[in-house]
Protein backbone atom coordinates (compact mmCIF):
# COMPACT_ATOMS: atom_id res chain seq x y z
CA UNK A 1 0.00 0.00 0.00
CA UNK A 2 1.16 3.49 -0.78
CA UNK A 3 0.75 6.31 1.69
CA UNK A 4 -2.56 7.47 0.27
CA UNK A 5 -3.11 6.67 -3.39
CA UNK A 6 -1.54 3.72 -5.08
CA UNK A 7 -2.23 0.02 -4.51
CA UNK A 8 1.19 -1.44 -5.19
CA UNK A 9 0.21 -5.12 -4.90
CA UNK A 10 -2.96 -7.16 -4.80
CA UNK A 11 -1.81 -10.75 -4.34
CA UNK A 12 0.05 -12.78 -1.74
CA UNK A 13 2.34 -15.80 -1.87
CA UNK A 14 1.45 -18.69 -0.17
CA UNK A 15 12.84 -16.71 27.26
CA UNK A 16 14.62 -13.34 26.88
CA UNK A 17 17.47 -14.81 24.86
CA UNK A 18 15.01 -16.83 22.73
CA UNK A 19 17.37 -19.80 22.74
CA UNK A 20 14.81 -22.59 23.21
CA UNK A 21 12.42 -21.92 20.38
CA UNK A 22 12.22 -23.73 17.08
CA UNK A 23 14.23 -21.36 14.97
CA UNK A 24 16.80 -21.03 12.25
CA UNK A 25 20.07 -19.11 12.55
CA UNK A 26 20.03 -17.38 9.17
CA UNK A 27 22.08 -14.40 8.14
CA UNK A 28 19.27 -11.85 8.20
CA UNK A 29 15.69 -11.22 7.11
CA UNK A 30 14.78 -10.58 3.50
CA UNK A 31 14.68 -7.00 2.27
CA UNK A 32 11.31 -5.37 2.93
CA UNK A 33 9.23 -2.23 3.35
CA UNK A 34 5.98 -1.62 5.20
CA UNK A 35 6.88 -4.04 8.00
CA UNK A 36 6.59 -3.46 11.74
CA UNK A 37 9.40 -3.50 14.29
CA UNK A 38 9.09 -3.12 18.06
CA UNK A 39 11.61 -3.34 20.87
CA UNK A 40 11.90 -4.39 24.49
CA UNK A 41 15.13 -2.37 24.75
CA UNK A 42 17.42 -5.35 24.11
CA UNK A 43 15.72 -7.10 21.21
CA UNK A 44 13.97 -5.81 18.12
CA UNK A 45 11.06 -7.89 16.80
CA UNK A 46 10.37 -7.63 13.05
CA UNK A 47 7.24 -8.93 11.32
CA UNK A 48 5.53 -8.57 7.97
CA UNK A 49 6.08 -6.17 5.12
CA UNK A 50 6.57 -6.87 1.44
CA UNK A 51 9.35 -7.05 -1.14
CA UNK A 52 9.74 -6.94 -4.89
CA UNK A 53 9.27 -10.05 -6.98
CA UNK A 54 12.45 -11.01 -8.81
CA UNK A 55 10.46 -11.98 -11.92
CA UNK A 56 9.74 -8.91 -14.01
CA UNK A 57 6.06 -8.28 -14.63
CA UNK A 58 4.85 -9.98 -11.47
CA UNK A 59 3.48 -8.21 -8.43
CA UNK A 60 5.40 -7.42 -5.29
CA UNK A 61 4.56 -9.96 -2.61
CA UNK A 62 4.03 -10.04 1.11
CA UNK A 63 6.58 -11.82 3.27
CA UNK A 64 5.72 -15.04 5.14
CA UNK A 65 3.27 -14.33 7.93
CA UNK A 66 4.54 -17.02 10.31
CA UNK A 67 8.08 -15.59 10.40
CA UNK A 68 9.13 -13.42 13.34
CA UNK A 69 12.67 -12.10 13.21
CA UNK A 70 14.47 -11.09 16.40
CA UNK A 71 17.50 -8.81 16.32
CA UNK A 72 19.77 -8.81 19.37
CA UNK A 73 20.68 -5.16 19.86
CA UNK A 74 23.75 -6.04 21.90
CA UNK A 75 25.34 -8.61 19.61
CA UNK A 76 23.95 -7.47 16.27
CA UNK A 77 22.75 -10.98 15.40
CA UNK A 78 19.45 -12.14 13.93
CA UNK A 79 17.30 -15.14 14.82
CA UNK A 80 14.21 -16.34 12.96
CA UNK A 81 11.31 -17.87 14.88
CA UNK A 82 8.36 -19.57 13.23
CA UNK A 83 5.14 -18.72 15.04
CA UNK A 84 1.84 -20.59 15.31
CA UNK A 85 -1.72 -20.02 16.49
CA UNK A 86 -3.98 -17.28 15.14
CA UNK A 87 -1.26 -16.04 12.82
CA UNK A 88 -2.20 -12.70 11.19
CA UNK A 89 -2.38 -12.62 7.40
CA UNK A 90 0.73 -11.35 5.66
CA UNK A 91 0.40 -7.56 5.64
CA UNK A 92 2.01 -4.19 5.19
CA UNK A 93 1.25 -0.93 6.97
CA UNK A 94 0.19 -2.54 10.25
CA UNK A 95 0.68 -0.83 13.61
CA UNK A 96 2.56 -2.58 16.42
CA UNK A 97 3.90 -1.97 19.92
CA UNK A 98 5.73 -4.01 22.56
CA UNK A 99 4.60 -3.63 26.18
CA UNK A 100 6.23 -5.80 28.86
CA UNK A 101 7.51 -8.09 26.07
CA UNK A 102 3.99 -8.63 24.73
CA UNK A 103 3.60 -7.71 21.05
CA UNK A 104 0.33 -6.08 19.98
CA UNK A 105 -0.57 -5.78 16.29
CA UNK A 106 -3.47 -3.85 14.76
CA UNK A 107 -4.68 -3.10 11.26
CA UNK A 108 -2.78 -3.26 8.02
CA UNK A 109 -3.32 -4.14 4.38
CA UNK A 110 -3.37 -7.70 3.04
CA UNK A 111 -4.26 -9.34 -0.27
CA UNK A 112 -7.98 -8.71 0.23
CA UNK A 113 -7.76 -5.13 1.46
CA UNK A 114 -7.60 -3.36 4.81
CA UNK A 115 -8.35 -4.95 8.18
CA UNK A 116 -9.14 -3.83 11.73
CA UNK A 117 -8.29 -7.08 13.50
CA UNK A 118 -6.22 -7.05 16.69
CA UNK A 119 -3.59 -9.65 17.61
CA UNK A 120 -1.13 -10.26 20.42
CA UNK A 121 1.94 -12.44 20.87
CA UNK A 122 3.56 -13.04 24.26
CA UNK A 123 7.32 -13.27 23.75
CA UNK A 124 7.72 -14.23 27.44
CA UNK A 125 6.14 -17.60 26.74
CA UNK A 126 8.10 -20.68 27.83
CA UNK A 127 6.49 -22.81 25.10
CA UNK A 128 8.72 -24.19 22.38
CA UNK A 129 6.93 -22.05 19.80
CA UNK A 130 5.55 -18.54 20.13
CA UNK A 131 1.79 -18.29 19.54
CA UNK A 132 -0.29 -15.50 18.07
CA UNK A 133 -3.71 -14.89 19.56
CA UNK A 134 -6.47 -12.94 17.86
CA UNK A 135 -8.38 -10.87 20.42
CA UNK A 136 -12.10 -10.32 19.99
CA UNK A 137 -12.31 -6.85 21.52
CA UNK A 138 -15.51 -5.26 22.79
CA UNK A 139 -16.82 -1.80 21.91
CA UNK A 140 -16.74 0.01 18.57
CA UNK A 141 -13.39 -0.64 16.85
CA UNK A 142 -11.54 1.68 14.48
CA UNK A 143 -12.33 1.30 10.81
CA UNK A 144 -10.20 -1.03 8.70
CA UNK A 145 -7.06 0.91 7.81
CA UNK A 146 -3.29 0.90 7.51
CA UNK A 147 -0.45 3.43 7.91
CA UNK A 148 -1.77 4.69 11.25
CA UNK A 149 0.16 5.63 14.41
CA UNK A 150 -0.02 4.56 18.05
CA UNK A 151 0.89 5.89 21.48
CA UNK A 152 1.31 3.75 24.61
CA UNK A 153 0.23 5.28 27.90
CA UNK A 154 -0.45 3.41 31.14
CA UNK A 155 -2.63 0.41 30.19
CA UNK A 156 -3.86 2.01 26.99
CA UNK A 157 -2.98 1.84 23.32
CA UNK A 158 -4.11 5.04 21.59
CA UNK A 159 -4.34 4.86 17.79
CA UNK A 160 -4.41 7.91 15.52
CA UNK A 161 -5.14 8.53 11.85
CA UNK A 162 -4.53 6.19 8.94
CA UNK A 163 -5.79 5.39 5.45
CA UNK A 164 -8.61 2.95 4.83
CA UNK A 165 -12.33 2.34 4.58
CA UNK A 166 -15.17 4.57 5.71
CA UNK A 167 -16.18 3.58 9.27
CA UNK A 168 -19.23 1.34 9.43
CA UNK A 169 -20.27 2.85 12.78
CA UNK A 170 -20.56 6.46 13.83
CA UNK A 171 -17.22 7.68 15.19
CA UNK A 172 -15.80 10.94 16.47
CA UNK A 173 -13.55 12.77 14.04
CA UNK A 174 -13.17 13.47 10.34
CA UNK A 175 -12.97 11.11 7.38
CA UNK A 176 -11.98 12.44 3.95
CA UNK A 177 -12.44 10.26 0.86
CA UNK A 178 -9.57 9.85 -1.58
CA UNK A 179 -11.31 10.53 -4.89
CA UNK A 180 -8.75 8.49 -6.82
CA UNK A 181 -9.61 5.37 -4.81
CA UNK A 182 -12.98 5.21 -6.58
CA UNK A 183 -11.17 4.45 -9.85
CA UNK A 184 -9.29 1.30 -8.84
CA UNK A 185 -11.29 -0.23 -6.00
CA UNK A 186 -14.81 -1.38 -5.25
CA UNK A 187 -14.21 -0.19 -1.68
CA UNK A 188 -13.10 3.46 -1.81
CA UNK A 189 -10.82 4.66 0.94
CA UNK A 190 -9.60 7.84 2.54
CA UNK A 191 -7.73 9.58 5.35
CA UNK A 192 -8.96 10.19 8.90
CA UNK A 193 -8.03 11.94 12.14
CA UNK A 194 -9.77 9.46 14.45
CA UNK A 195 -8.46 8.72 17.94
CA UNK A 196 -9.29 5.29 19.36
CA UNK A 197 -8.30 3.81 22.72
CA UNK A 198 -7.84 0.12 23.49
CA UNK A 199 -7.60 -0.86 27.16
CA UNK A 200 -5.12 -3.76 27.33
CA UNK A 201 -6.65 -5.05 30.58
CA UNK A 202 -10.28 -5.24 29.41
CA UNK A 203 -9.75 -5.19 25.61
CA UNK A 204 -12.55 -2.66 25.20
CA UNK A 205 -12.43 -0.03 22.44
CA UNK A 206 -13.47 3.55 23.20
CA UNK A 207 -13.05 7.07 21.83
CA UNK A 208 -12.10 10.11 23.90
CA UNK A 209 -13.75 13.50 23.44
CA UNK A 210 -10.79 15.65 22.47
CA UNK A 211 -10.46 19.42 22.74
CA UNK A 212 -8.26 21.88 20.91
CA UNK A 213 -7.59 21.88 17.18
CA UNK A 214 -6.74 18.38 15.95
CA UNK A 215 -4.27 17.68 13.15
CA UNK A 216 -5.73 17.24 9.70
CA UNK A 217 -6.57 13.70 8.59
CA UNK A 218 -3.40 11.89 7.54
CA UNK A 219 -1.62 8.60 6.95
CA UNK A 220 1.99 7.43 6.93
CA UNK A 221 2.73 9.88 9.74
CA UNK A 222 4.90 9.06 12.76
CA UNK A 223 3.92 8.98 16.43
CA UNK A 224 5.99 8.94 19.64
CA UNK A 225 5.08 8.94 23.34
CA UNK A 226 6.99 10.96 25.95
CA UNK A 227 5.41 11.12 29.40
CA UNK A 228 1.73 11.94 28.99
CA UNK A 229 2.19 13.49 25.55
CA UNK A 230 1.50 11.73 22.28
CA UNK A 231 3.48 13.46 19.51
CA UNK A 232 2.65 13.22 15.82
CA UNK A 233 4.78 14.61 12.99
CA UNK A 234 4.13 14.84 9.27
CA UNK A 235 2.27 12.34 7.14
CA UNK A 236 0.28 12.58 3.94
CA UNK A 237 -3.11 14.20 3.35
CA UNK A 238 -4.26 14.37 -0.26
CA UNK A 239 -1.38 15.76 -2.35
CA UNK A 240 0.62 17.16 0.57
CA UNK A 241 3.26 15.54 2.73
CA UNK A 242 3.39 17.70 5.81
CA UNK A 243 5.90 18.85 8.43
CA UNK A 244 3.54 19.98 11.18
CA UNK A 245 4.09 18.84 14.76
CA UNK A 246 1.30 18.26 17.28
CA UNK A 247 0.83 16.53 20.59
CA UNK A 248 -2.19 15.11 22.36
CA UNK A 249 -2.28 15.32 26.16
CA UNK A 250 -3.09 11.73 27.07
CA UNK A 251 -4.60 12.74 30.44
CA UNK A 252 -6.83 15.63 29.33
CA UNK A 253 -7.21 14.71 25.62
CA UNK A 254 -6.35 18.24 24.52
CA UNK A 255 -4.67 18.75 21.15
CA UNK A 256 -1.85 21.29 20.82
CA UNK A 257 0.06 22.34 17.71
CA UNK A 258 3.73 23.16 18.20
CA UNK A 259 5.44 25.88 16.15
CA UNK A 260 9.17 25.18 16.62
CA UNK A 261 11.75 27.95 16.55
CA UNK A 262 14.29 28.09 13.71
CA UNK A 263 14.70 25.60 10.89
CA UNK A 264 12.40 22.61 10.54
CA UNK A 265 12.52 19.33 8.61
CA UNK A 266 10.86 19.31 5.20
CA UNK A 267 7.40 17.78 4.91
CA UNK A 268 7.38 14.01 4.59
CA UNK A 269 5.56 10.72 5.01
CA UNK A 270 6.81 7.17 5.66
CA UNK A 271 9.40 8.47 8.14
CA UNK A 272 10.19 7.38 11.71
CA UNK A 273 9.99 9.31 14.99
CA UNK A 274 11.59 7.71 18.03
CA UNK A 275 11.71 8.91 21.66
CA UNK A 276 15.34 8.79 22.82
CA UNK A 277 15.09 10.59 26.17
CA UNK A 278 12.56 12.37 28.34
CA UNK A 279 13.26 15.54 26.32
CA UNK A 280 14.17 14.42 22.80
CA UNK A 281 12.68 12.77 19.73
CA UNK A 282 14.71 11.40 16.81
CA UNK A 283 13.43 11.81 13.24
CA UNK A 284 14.86 9.94 10.27
CA UNK A 285 14.13 9.56 6.57
CA UNK A 286 10.84 9.62 4.72
CA UNK A 287 9.39 10.67 1.37
CA UNK A 288 8.70 14.23 0.19
CA UNK A 289 5.78 15.73 -1.71
CA UNK A 290 7.90 15.74 -4.87
CA UNK A 291 8.61 12.01 -4.35
CA UNK A 292 12.19 12.28 -3.12
CA UNK A 293 13.49 9.72 -0.59
CA UNK A 294 15.18 11.31 2.42
CA UNK A 295 18.28 10.44 4.45
CA UNK A 296 18.30 13.39 6.84
CA UNK A 297 18.05 13.00 10.61
CA UNK A 298 16.87 15.48 13.25
CA UNK A 299 16.40 15.66 16.98
CA UNK A 300 13.50 17.59 18.45
CA UNK A 301 14.08 19.13 21.89
CA UNK A 302 10.76 19.19 23.73
CA UNK A 303 11.74 21.71 26.41
CA UNK A 304 13.22 24.17 23.88
CA UNK A 305 10.66 23.49 21.14
CA UNK A 306 13.31 23.34 18.44
CA UNK A 307 14.59 21.00 15.75
CA UNK A 308 18.32 20.33 15.51
CA UNK A 309 19.94 18.74 12.44
CA UNK A 310 21.65 15.48 13.42
CA UNK A 311 24.93 14.69 11.67
CA UNK A 312 25.44 11.04 10.79
CA UNK A 313 27.39 8.84 8.33
CA UNK A 314 24.34 7.39 6.54
CA UNK A 315 23.55 10.39 4.33
CA UNK A 316 23.96 8.24 1.19
CA UNK A 317 21.37 5.76 2.45
CA UNK A 318 17.89 7.26 2.17
CA UNK A 319 15.05 5.25 3.67
CA UNK A 320 11.27 5.39 3.61
CA UNK A 321 8.63 3.06 5.08
CA UNK A 322 11.40 1.68 7.29
CA UNK A 323 11.24 1.08 11.04
CA UNK A 324 13.23 2.54 13.93
CA UNK A 325 13.60 1.29 17.51
CA UNK A 326 15.53 2.65 20.49
CA UNK A 327 17.91 0.40 22.40
CA UNK A 328 18.89 0.49 26.06
CA UNK A 329 22.36 1.60 24.92
CA UNK A 330 21.28 4.99 23.56
CA UNK A 331 21.07 3.92 19.93
CA UNK A 332 18.34 4.07 17.32
CA UNK A 333 18.22 0.94 15.17
CA UNK A 334 16.76 1.51 11.69
CA UNK A 335 15.84 -1.56 9.67
CA UNK A 336 14.65 -2.10 6.13
CA UNK A 337 12.62 0.31 4.07
CA UNK A 338 13.03 1.54 0.53
CA UNK A 339 15.99 3.56 -0.77
CA UNK A 340 14.27 5.18 -3.76
CA UNK A 341 10.82 6.08 -5.09
CA UNK A 342 8.61 3.32 -3.71
CA UNK A 343 5.74 4.22 -6.02
CA UNK A 344 7.70 3.02 -9.06
CA UNK A 345 7.29 -0.42 -7.59
CA UNK A 346 9.05 -2.45 -10.32
CA UNK A 347 12.22 -0.47 -9.52
CA UNK A 348 11.81 -0.20 -5.74
CA UNK A 349 15.11 -0.75 -3.91
CA UNK A 350 13.94 -2.46 -0.73
CA UNK A 351 16.59 -2.94 1.96
CA UNK A 352 17.41 -5.41 4.71
CA UNK A 353 20.24 -3.35 6.13
CA UNK A 354 20.59 -2.18 9.71
CA UNK A 355 21.57 1.47 10.24
CA UNK A 356 22.67 2.43 13.74
CA UNK A 357 22.50 5.99 15.06
CA UNK A 358 24.24 6.74 18.36
CA UNK A 359 22.11 9.44 19.96
CA UNK A 360 23.54 9.17 23.48
CA UNK A 361 27.05 8.49 24.83
CA UNK A 362 27.87 4.79 25.04
CA UNK A 363 28.26 3.19 28.45
CA UNK A 364 31.71 2.36 29.79
CA UNK A 365 30.90 -1.35 29.57
CA UNK A 366 29.89 -0.99 25.92
CA UNK A 367 33.04 0.97 25.06
CA UNK A 368 35.20 -1.60 26.85
CA UNK A 369 33.59 -4.53 25.01
CA UNK A 370 34.08 -2.79 21.68
CA UNK A 371 37.75 -2.22 22.53
CA UNK A 372 38.18 -5.88 23.45
CA UNK A 373 36.71 -6.92 20.10
CA UNK A 374 38.69 -4.33 18.15
CA UNK A 375 41.95 -5.65 19.60
CA UNK A 376 40.89 -9.30 19.70
CA UNK A 377 44.20 -10.71 18.45
CA UNK A 378 46.10 -8.88 21.16
CA UNK A 379 43.65 -9.63 23.99
CA UNK A 380 42.21 -13.05 23.09
CA UNK A 381 44.45 -14.92 25.52
CA UNK A 382 43.00 -12.87 28.39
CA UNK A 383 39.33 -13.36 27.55
CA UNK A 384 38.91 -16.18 30.03
CA UNK A 385 39.59 -13.67 32.79
CA UNK A 386 36.36 -11.86 31.96
CA UNK A 387 33.22 -12.46 34.04
CA UNK A 388 31.05 -15.12 32.40
CA UNK A 389 28.31 -12.73 31.28
CA UNK A 390 30.85 -10.42 29.62
CA UNK A 391 32.64 -13.35 27.97
CA UNK A 392 29.29 -14.51 26.62
CA UNK A 393 28.66 -11.05 25.17
CA UNK A 394 32.07 -10.97 23.50
CA UNK A 395 31.64 -14.43 21.99
CA UNK A 396 28.17 -13.60 20.70
CA UNK A 397 29.38 -10.52 18.90
CA UNK A 398 31.51 -12.59 16.55
CA UNK A 399 29.57 -13.61 13.49
CA UNK A 400 27.52 -10.41 13.52
CA UNK A 401 26.53 -9.23 10.08
CA UNK A 402 24.56 -6.72 8.08
CA UNK A 403 25.13 -3.95 10.61
CA UNK A 404 26.30 -0.49 9.65
CA UNK A 405 27.11 1.59 12.72
CA UNK A 406 27.64 5.25 13.51
Curated annotation (Swiss-Prot):
Pfam families: Kelch_KLHDC2_KLHL20_DRC7. Its main location: nucleus. It comes from the Eukaryota. One of its GO terms (molecular function) is ubiquitin-like ligase-substrate adaptor activity. Keywords: Kelch repeat, Nucleus, Repeat, Ubl conjugation, Ubl conjugation pathway. It is found in: Nucleus. Kelch repeats lie at residues 31-85, 92-136, 148-207, 221-259, 271-311, 322-359. InterPro entries: Kelch-typ_b-propeller. Pathway: Protein modification; protein ubiquitination. Transmembrane segments: none annotated. GO terms for cellular component: Cul2-RING ubiquitin ligase complex; nuclear body; nuclear membrane; nucleus. One of its GO terms (biological process) is proteasome-mediated ubiquitin-dependent protein catabolic process. Autoubiquitinated by the CRL2(KLHDC2) E3 ligase complex. Substrate-recognition component of a Cul2-RING (CRL2) E3 ubiquitin-protein ligase complex of the DesCEND (destruction via C-end degrons) pathway, which recognizes a C-degron located at the extreme C terminus of target proteins, leading to their ubiquitination and degradation. The C-degron recognized by the DesCEND pathway is usually a motif of less than ten residues and can be present in full-length proteins, truncated proteins or proteolytically cleaved forms. Component of a CRL2(KLHDC2) E3 ubiquitin-protein ligase complex, also named ECS(KLHDC2) complex, composed of CUL2, Elongin BC (ELOB and ELOC), RBX1 and substrate-specific adapter KLHDC2. May form oligomers as a KLHDC2-ELOB-ELOC complex; this interaction is autoinhibitory for the E3 ligase complex as the substrate-binding site of KLHDC2 is blocked in the oligomer. Interacts with CREB3; interaction is direct and specific as it does not interact with CREB1, ATF4, ATF6, JUN, FOS, CEBPA or herpes simplex virus transactivator VP16. This is Kelch domain-containing protein 2.
